[in-house]
Amino acid sequence: MRRLMAVALIAALAAAGTAAAQERKVKVGVLKLTSSAPIFVGVEKGFFKAFGIAPELVFFQAAAPIATALAAGQIEVGATGLTAALYNIVLQGEKLWIVADKGREWPGYPLVGIVVQRELWDKGEIRSVKDLRGKRIGLTTLGSTFHFHLGNILEKEGLKLADLKVIPLQAMPSTVEALKGKQVDAIMVPQPFPGRTEAEGFGKILAWAGDLYAWQIATVFYGKGFAADREKAVDFMKGYVKASRYYHDAVLVQKDGRVVPGRNYDEVVQITAKYTGARPEIIKIGFPYQDRNGRLLVPDIEKQMTWWVEHGFMKRAIPLKEIVDTSFVEAAIQAVKE
């Protein structure tokens, strides 16, 4: 009997050792934002682990440094906004691939808020986008997703970026602090920051940017080396697709034209609160939209590059076939059944 137990124990330890050896670490660059919820859900629910992937989350303060870190080989996967910096890294000869959806600015789904000083709102000084003319508006960096989004919103309203004083403040927390300290009149920041400004009484959400201009703001992108390891890259995407579906069914469900809590809503709220450090009631203000299976709005990526070229932030647009690869997400969708 003892001999049998010893054999069984050795077999169990060997199996555990094999499983540990098969679990492949992947460094993933992310921001502590509500839009990163699918990544957080995938980690907490073990969806990546189910396919032998152990994500190591590396947190950043803004989107552009994630692209730089990916190019430098400090991370293998980036999950954040599409910036001019990312496109320019590719133009400079580095290879990376945009592979999946990680968030869209979409009507009815809060992501980036245009937030104004509460005092200016109460005085009636800023009540619309057109009232931003001549005002100081803070954002992370020039060439950021916020820069692109603000420019396109202004153009729809008959304004130009030159009609405002755009102030780059490098990181999201410092952008919020600038509004609090009245160094700027308005800011553009993603959830949970808009909700926090209102909860603390110094900010007022003027509008949700996705209600004014819809686009593919954020994606998952792979570094050259990671993409070359096809099996590992597809396995990561399998976990991501599973997490994306879970996220979608929990927090993006609509009924009669309104977003309503779906299955596992409270669980996803708690997971997101844990990783962002925001209170659950702030998280509940809303989650950004993304495709249930993680599929990209590919034509929108081309539109973005055209805009950056027109505004002097890129020398030329990159052919989509040289920067977008949807084969990873399509392979994962086929492999991960409902």
Which residues make up each language-model segment?
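Short, glycine-/small- and polar/acidic-enriched structural segments
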Residues: 22-161, 165-169, 185-191, 206-214
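Bacterial N-terminal signal peptides
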Residues: 7-16
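Loop-centered beta-sheet repeat module
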Residues: 167, 171-203
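Periplasmic-binding protein-like
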Residues: 103-113, 198-226, 237, 244, ...
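Bacterial N-terminal signal peptides that target proteins for export
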Residues: 1-6
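Secondary-structure end/capping motifs
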Residues: 228-315
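Conserved C-terminal helix/tail region of periplasmic/extracytoplasmic solute-binding proteins
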Residues: 301-338
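Short, hydrophobic alpha-helical packing/hinge segments within bilobed ligand-binding/sensory domains
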Residues: 66-67, 85, 174-178, 194, ...
